[in-house]
Structure formats: structure tokens, C-alpha cells
Curated annotation (Swiss-Prot):
Stated name of the protein: Dioxygenase andF
Family membership: Belongs to the PhyH family.
GO MF annotation terms: dioxygenase activity; metal ion binding
Oligomeric and partner information: Homodimer.
UniProt cofactor(s): Fe cation
Length: 285
């Protein structure tokens, strides 16, 4: 099978060009998505957390996709100030999400995030699509809007040898029920720290095998329309931590009211906005 190429674009690529590539190929890498200071800050803030995390699946539904030498700790908005105050504010994330979800769904919010850490000796992850967590994906047609999108960002180099993520460009256009792509159709996303792989829910992908002597580490942030319940709740975050965030991130994490495409309010307090009822402030304004 002839697979389209995986596109690598610079940070200053016009968003219209990025959306065109996503429509045609289903995925791409944005170079220097994060600056090196942000990369290092995230690494410093999560390193002890990751090192003390036991590898392997934590839930039954993870058994097929989380290997015995994979660490995927979540709760990053609590563990990393850089993640909650800078990464989740990223202009590229919101430019893409607004165009992907806005016209059909209206507002979107944060679904969940985790570290993507592979120890040496980890095997190849089964090839999968992220939208299988949504039962309605069984009825989704290739021309329908995606149900979710994931931004996978590199904290270390991603190579073929250390288990960098592989994708099958063009597979987002396959009909439902299509078999996963063959191994020879998977294309490695070769990334430097700070690069980001954009993965809509319909894109077939998987982590590679880590045949190197070093760990491979990245982290993710996924978003979906506000019609859907997020994997992660953030109502355990201290109030002072929430008020350090921008109003946009507060909305992403469920502390503000959202609007559907027809301006119907959801996640509201009575007939008013949740943020008004709780007296929420943002010192980031």
C-alpha cells in the first residue's frame, strides 16, 4: 500500500496550511512546538513523579495498549505548573481545536493528559485509534468531524531505535471496521525535544519498540468537544492553583461554563455561568 508522507512543518506555518495537511494526511509534526525552556521545566517538574511511577497498565482497558515497561502517569495539571499554566494555553493547540471542533460542536475542553515514557526493552505497542474510547466512533464516517485530538510532545528525542511514535498517514480516511495498518505501512515520527505530533482520534498509530539503552519520554494533552465527559477531573486542584490559570485553561479544566455550537450553555450553575456562581478569579489576566 502506498502511504502518504508524514509532513514536518515549522512553527510559523500558517494555520490554514496545517489544517489542510490534517485534512489530507490525518497527522503531522510541528517543529519547535515548545521552546527548550518549557521542555526543561516540564522535565524538571515531572521527573521524580515519573521515576517513582510503577510501569505497566493500571486498568483493565489499558492492558492491550500499555506495555509492562511503559509509564503513563496522569494528573499533570496538578504535578506541573508549566503544564497547567503554559502548555494548556498553547496558541497552536487552541487554533487547531477551534477549527476542528468549533463549527460542528462549539466549545471544546481538556480530556486528559499523561507522560509517555518507554523504558529500554519495551515492545511495540499495538496499533490503535484514540477514538475507540467513544462508543459512537462505531458509527463515525471518514467525512465526519473527529471526536478527539491528541498533541503528543517530545521531551527527549524520538527515534526509530528508542520507540518513537509511528503513524499511518491517510488512515483517517478509511471506513469504519477497516483492519489496522500493516507494520510496513507505519511511518516513524522522528522528533527532537519540543516537537509535537498532532493526532486526531481517527489516526492509526502506536509507540515503537525501545531497543535503545535509554528511556524515551514525551507527554500528551488531548481535547474533545464539551459534549463528552473528560477522562480526568480537576476539581481536586486547590483553589489558589486554579486561580493562577488563565480563564481559557480554567474553562478547559471544567471551572467555567461552555457553549454548544448553537449557543446553548452547558456545565452551568442554574441558569448562570459556573464561574460567576463560584466567584472564580484569574490572576493570569
Amino acid at each position: 500500500m502506498t502511504v502518504p508522507q508524514l509532513h514536518y512543518v515549522p512553527y510559523d506555518t500558517p494555520v490554514e496550511d496545517v489544517m489542510r495537511i490534517l485534512e489530507e494526511c490525518g497527522t503531522l509534526v510541528i517543529r519547535n512546538f515548545l521552546d527548550q525552556k518549557t521542555v526543561q521545566n516540564v522535565q524538571n517538574e515531572v521527573d521524580d513523579y515519573v521515576r517513582n511511577w510503577n510501569p505497566g497498565p493500571k486498568y483493565n482497558h489499558d492492558i492491550k495498549t500499555v506495555g509492562s515497561k511503559t509509564k503513563q502517569p496522569s494528573n499533570l495539571s496538578l504535578m506541573s505548573k508549566t503544564y497547567r499554566c503554559e502548555v494548556l494555553n498553547h496558541p497552536w493547540m487552541h487554533a487547531i481545536c477551534e477549527r476542528m471542533f468549533g463549527p460542528t460542536y462549539g466549545d471544546y475542553w481538556f480530556n486528559g493528559g499523561s507522560i509517555l515514557h518507554l523504558e529500554p526493552g519495551e515492545h511495540t505497542q499495538p496499533i490503535h485509534q484514540d477514538h475507540v474510547f467513544y462508543h459512537i466512533s462505531k458509527w463515525r464516517r471518514p467525512t465526519d468531524p473527529d471526536l478527539t485530538i491528541n498533541f503528543a510532545m517530545a521531551l527527549t528525542e524520538f527515534t526509530v531505535e528508542n520507540g518513537g511514535t509511528r503513524v499511518c498517514p491517510g488512515s483517517h480516511l478509511w471506513e469504519n471496521g477497516h483492519a489496522p495498518p500493516a507494520e510496513e505501512d507505519m511511518v516513524p515520527a522522528l522528533m527532537q525535544p519540543g516537537d509535537a505530533l498532532i493526532l486526531p482520534g481517527s489516526m492509526w498509530h502506536s509507540a515503537g519498540a525501545n531497543r535503545s539503552s535509554e528511556y524515551r519520554r514525551g507527554f500528551a494533552a488531548s481535547f474533545h468537544p464539551c459534549h463528552f465527559t473528560p477522562i480526568e477531573s480537576h476539581h481536586h486542584l486547590p483553589r489558589e492553583m486554579v486561580e493562577e490559570m488563565s480563564p481559557l485553561v480554567q474553562k478547559m479544566l471544567g471551572f467555567r461554563t461552555l457553549n454548544l455550537h448553537n449557543n446553548v450553555k452547558v456545565w452551568k450553575a442554574g441558569e448562570g455561568n459556573l464561574e460567576d456562581a463560584t466567584g472564580l478569579k484569574s490572576i493570569a489576566v
